[in-house]
């Protein structure tokens, strides 16, 4: 089946964020998986309604409980999976490469990110992985991109500048395994322009992640 523009933007934007694709056939077929903590249940159901045509008739979002070793607490989460779909391989080929050393698929920013980073895709990307930097102190925002390669993160930076004239900086972050990652910082000077690009496509329950221009949130 062909995808609508909203479905394409949701998939692309959320693959830059929390979304992922899974394969059990050595990359021949793929399914999309969305997973969010219980506080974001409404947002997960928003994703489900858009991608429902890709899901099985009996597929519904499901709640699960996992133990978080970092906090020694149980965490409630909601998730859903689509069925495998030929349209998803297009995105998998952009985002994923197979690492022979680890025997795992690795996700990174597509080389052609600029081609697909529409305002709506950017909104989903930010909703998934963005946050205010200092609520009540600054209008600056940030996007947690440290899981990507430095080159991939720079590709996002260049796309934001070329497409929307939004200047950003990179902040170094040390990951749990000791590797260095890079988080995209959206300074105050760029926050207004960034907000105007994504504002028409924000999901109501996630608007609080975006600066209102007065050091608060929408």
Swiss-Prot record:
It comes from the Eukaryota. Pfam families: LAGLIDADG_2 (PF03161). Its EC number is 3.1.-.-. GO terms for biological process: intron homing. It is an enzyme of class 3 (hydrolase). One of its GO terms (molecular function) is endonuclease activity. Its main location: plastid. Keywords: Chloroplast, Endonuclease, Hydrolase, Intron homing, Nuclease, Plastid. It is found in: Plastid, Chloroplast. GO terms for cellular component: chloroplast. Probable endonuclease involved in intron homing. Encoded in the group-I intron of the subunit rRNA-encoding gene (rrnL), it generates a staggered cut with 4-nt (CTCG) 3'-OH overhangs 2 bp downstream from the intron insertion site. Belongs to the LAGLIDADG endonuclease family. This is DNA endonuclease I-ChuI. It comes from Chlamydomonas applanata (Chlamydomonas humicola).
């Amino acid at each position: 089946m062909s995808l609508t523009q909203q479905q394409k933007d949701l998939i692309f934007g959320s693959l830059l964020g929390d979304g992922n694709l899974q394969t059990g056939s050595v990359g021949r077929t793929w399914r999309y998986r969305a997973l969010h903590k219980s506080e974001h249940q409404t947002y997960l159901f928003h994703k489900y309604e858009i991608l429902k045509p890709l899901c099985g008739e009996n597929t519904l979002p499901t709640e699960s409980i996992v133990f978080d070793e970092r906090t020694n607490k149980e965490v409630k989460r909601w998730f859903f999976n689509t069925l495998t779909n030929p349209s998803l391989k297009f995105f998998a080929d952009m985002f994923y490469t197979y690492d022979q050393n680890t025997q795992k698929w690795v996700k990174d920013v597509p080389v052609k990110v600029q081609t697909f980073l529409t305002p709506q895709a950017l909104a989903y990307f930010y909703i998934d992985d963005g946050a205010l930097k200092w609520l009540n102190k600054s209008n600056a925002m940030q996007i947690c991109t440290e899981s990507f390669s430095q080159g991939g993160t720079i590709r996002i930076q260049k796309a934001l500048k070329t497409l929307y004239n939004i200047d950003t900086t990179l902040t170094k972050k040390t990951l749990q395994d000791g590797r260095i990652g890079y988080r995209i910082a959206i300074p105050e000077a760029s926050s207004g322009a960034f907000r105007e690009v994504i504002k028409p496509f924000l999901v109501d329950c996630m608007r609080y992640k975006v600066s209102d221009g007065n050091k608060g949130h929408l």
